[in-house]
Each structure stands twice: as C-alpha cells, then as structure tokens.
Amino acid sequence: MTYTYSFRPVRPEEGDQIAFIEQVCFSPATALSPETMRARAAELPDMFLAAIAHPEVPSGMPAGLGSVPAMRRDNDSVQQPDGRQDACTDGKSSSASGMKAASPDDAHDQIAGYITMMMTDEEHFRDAFFEDPSLHQPNGANVMLLGLEVLPSFRHQGLAAELLNRTIRQAEKEGRRKLVLTCRDDKIAMYEKFGFQLCGISKSTLGGVTWYEMEHRLQK
C-alpha cells in the first residue's frame, strides 16, 4: 500500500498515539515514559509536527482520505535518524511491550511519525527539556529538538528528512537563531548533510549513552 502524507501539529487527544510511537522507536533505556509524552502532547501540542498517513485510494474508488494533496514517496532511501532523533536502530528491543498501537479505527488520523521540540533562550541541550514542559519559552531564540520518530512500517519514505527540513524552514521563517539536537556518534555525518555542525559531547546522560550535541545555526 502507498500513502500520501499531510503535516500538522498534534492534537491533545492524540497523546496515546504519541506515547506509543515513543515506546516503539526507542529502547527501554532511552524511551520517555508514556505519562511524559501524553503530558507534553496535552500541554505543548504545537511543539510537535506530525506526519499523517492517508492510504491512497485505487483509481475509480471514492476519494476519501487518499485524496489529500500532500507529499508522496513510495521508496525513498533517506536514512531514518538515530539518537534522540531515533528509530530504535540501536539494536535494542523497543519498550512498547504490552502497549496497543493506535489505528485509524482508534483515531481519525493515523500518525506515521513526528518531530517534537521546545523553544528556549538557553544555548545548550539539557535533559530537563525532556520532562518539564514549563521550560518552553514561546519566543525563545533557539529550538531544542527532543525527538524525531517514525514508525517502522512508514520508514524508507523520506518522512524523517521531510519532518526535519520542514522544522528547519519554520525556524528560519520565525527568525530563530539556531536548532540544537543530540545524537550518537554514528549519526553525526548524516546530520551534517542537513546543515548541523558538531559542538562536542552533550551534557545529556539519558539512558547512560554518550550523546553528541549538534547545532544548525540560522543567524550569527
């Protein structure tokens, strides 16, 4: 099956889908709790950009969801990012055991993946951004990228790259100074292709992993 994709902020009531995707895409050591993700979706829905999957309708059938004019890619080779911009590609099992995936029957829209972030005037990444939505400063100069996640069944279609590129363009439009993310060392070269530069080892200690901080500077 092929899909078209539209992009929008999440809705507070989609917290269960957001929490499930987090558990699927990260190992138990690095996944944030379902409660944390539901709370963030409820308090900061605009700080998520979600890719919504719409099954394409075969020719001759009623249009329905498949008619959404949006990005369409059937087999893109763009690699899914890793680290806290992750897809559970670290060889560890995901932490979604016992959780139920949201489907079109459970919610009107099916979220294929998302990028989540927080605005701040702080210059460097810290783990408190993951857990404390009150640290969000709507007019903050910098964008802290907290996660980039795509469900396994929707990977290899360029969604991760599209979500990241849309976020970069939006930050430019809003006049932000820079975007900051953390990743593992084997993903540094990939993020450099998106304009990010290595800053050094991050202060993040999430999951006992060595993270590297990178930034994409938009303004000097």
What are these regions (language model features)?
Residues 4-17:
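A short beta-loop-alpha structural element at the N-terminal edge
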Residues 9, 19-34, 40:
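Helix-loop element at the rim of GNAT/NAT acetyltransferase active sites that forms part
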Residues 48-53:
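Cytosolic beta-strand hydrophobic patch enriched in CBS
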Residues 57-149, 155, 205-210:
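Conserved acyl-donor/pantetheine-binding loop and adjacent beta-alpha core of acyl/acetyltransferases
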Residues 146, 153-155, 174, 180, ...:
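Acidic/histidine-enriched, beta-strand-rich ligand/metal-binding domains
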Residues 150, 156-169:
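Conserved acetyl-CoA-binding loop-helix of GNAT-fold acetyltransferases
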Residues 164, 171-184:
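Conserved GNAT acetyl-CoA-binding A-motif
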Residues 173, 185-209:
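Conserved active-site alpha-helix within GNAT-family acetyltransferase domains
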